[in-house]
């Protein structure tokens, strides 16, 4: 991936990364908004106009499905050592993840999350492992929506980290 601020930078990055590529707004993108496919050099100006600001361009991933893990990171109070969970020692970080969900989009908007995903057990385990790795390197506490692409050969690739309650975690009481 590369940061780009001009059509010339976008064209140069796409020459290096290959076409097609995906241009993503650095700020304000949500639920597919701010994402524009770049099929050729001729698309550079229009693609940048569409994202309306600084962007990232990345290699296009031909994925089988998008999956996500809702993950939560908390900690004991550093000043008092208090926690809501007696099983957590003072100063330790508490983490939890929910089952891997499969996200179904229509017109770039998430319309349905299938839990558990139809992914292989190996792919689900890998998504959970990477989600825990993400929590390990993030300084913030709270709920994270961590999205992945699952490629056609079952590889898991990190797509997005949303440091907030994520719409793929808006389950019904029957689904929880």
Locate predicted features.
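A conserved helix-loop-beta module that forms one wall/lid of the active-site cleft
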Residues: 1-35
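Charged catalytic carboxylate motif
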Residues: 9, 43, 126, 130
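CheY-like receiver
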Residues: 12-13, 47-50
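Rossmann-fold NAD(P)-binding glycine/threonine-rich loop
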Residues: 37, 41-43
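Phosphate-binding core of ATP-grasp and ATP-grasp-like enzymes
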Residues: 50-119, 124-158, 162-170
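Active-site lid/adjacent beta-loop-alpha segment flanking the redox-cofactor pocket in flavoenzymes
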Residues: 173
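Flexible glycine-rich active-site/ligand-binding loops centered on an Asp-His dyad
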Residues: 176
């Amino acid at each position: 991936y590369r940061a780009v601020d001009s059509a010339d930078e976008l064209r140069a990055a796409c020459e290096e990364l290959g076409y097609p590529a995906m241009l993503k707004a650095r700020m304000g993108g949500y639920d597919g908004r701010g994402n524009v496919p770049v099929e050729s050099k001729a698309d550079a100006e229009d693609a940048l106009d569409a994202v309306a600001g600084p962007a990232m361009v990345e290699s296009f991933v031909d994925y089988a499905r998008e999956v996500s893990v809702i993950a939560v990171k908390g900690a004991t109070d550093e000043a008092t050592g208090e926690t809501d969970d007696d099983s957590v020692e003072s100063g330790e970080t508490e983490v939890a993840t929910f089952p891997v969900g499969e996200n179904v989009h229509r017109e770039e908007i998430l319309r349905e999350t299938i839990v558990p995903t139809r992914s292989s057990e190996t792919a689900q385990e890998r998504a959970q492992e990477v989600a825990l790795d993400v929590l390990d390197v993030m300084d913030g506490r709270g709920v994270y929506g961590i999205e992945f692409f699952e490629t056609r050969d079952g590889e898991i690739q990190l797509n997005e980290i949303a440091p907030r309650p994520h719409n793929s975690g808006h389950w019904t009481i029957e689904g929880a």
